[in-house]
Amino acid sequence: MVSVAFKQNLKKKYGIKFNNEKLLEDAFTHSSYANEHPGRKDYEKLEFLGDAVLELAVSDYLYRHFPRLNEGELTRMRSNIVRTEGFSEFAIECGFPEEINLGKGEEKAGARKRKTLLEDVFEAFNGALFLDQGMPAVQHFLHLTVYPLIAEGDFNASRDYKTELQERLQVNGPVKIEYQVISEDESKPSFKVQLLVNGEKVSEGQGRNKKAAEQQAAQAALDKNK
């Protein structure tokens, strides 16, 4: 069962109160739990729907907010957003892992922390929200969770700063480039890395995942050498 505290947080933080709470329950029910509890439905069909809903919602947002990007750049950015790592982090941020109904075997196997499962639940939740309240409610939820990070450039696929930096530094021969994690907070999540060139610190970067932090560090290094 989805906890009362979670439902209260949904209302307080995101303004979401399900009219049909069974949809919410189904969105957090893994097939392993449904197999152990006859009569319970798992989230697989909601996940199927949510995948399509999220792709449409994100595509619409990118089309409206990034008019200068071409089709290829928009596609790459969308791919970065909807990848497993991205949605699993949003699921963690929203407190989804604790609410998932798992079978005993999956619970023992640590499935609650599995990124692919968290991505599935995030998609299922949005599928359930779409059925319960329509696309405007989904867009509202994404405006509070996903879209702010798109606006900040966390998923920018139009430039690859790491590759640009590597090409610039190695123009005269091999150079050792390292990205080291300084700190991480998986509860948020947030990563901070430092960039070393031939063992010397050049810059730092921070992001909601290691890849984003490394890109920011590379961008900072490029900005220093403009």
From Swiss-Prot:
Its cofactor is Mg(2+). SMART domains: DSRM (SM00358), RIBOc (SM00535). Mg(2+) binds at E47, D120, E123. Its EC number is 3.1.26.3. CDD domains: DSRM_RNAse_III_family (cd10845), RIBOc (cd00593). The keyword Cytoplasm applies. Its main location: cytoplasm. Homodimer. Belongs to the ribonuclease III family. This is Ribonuclease 3.
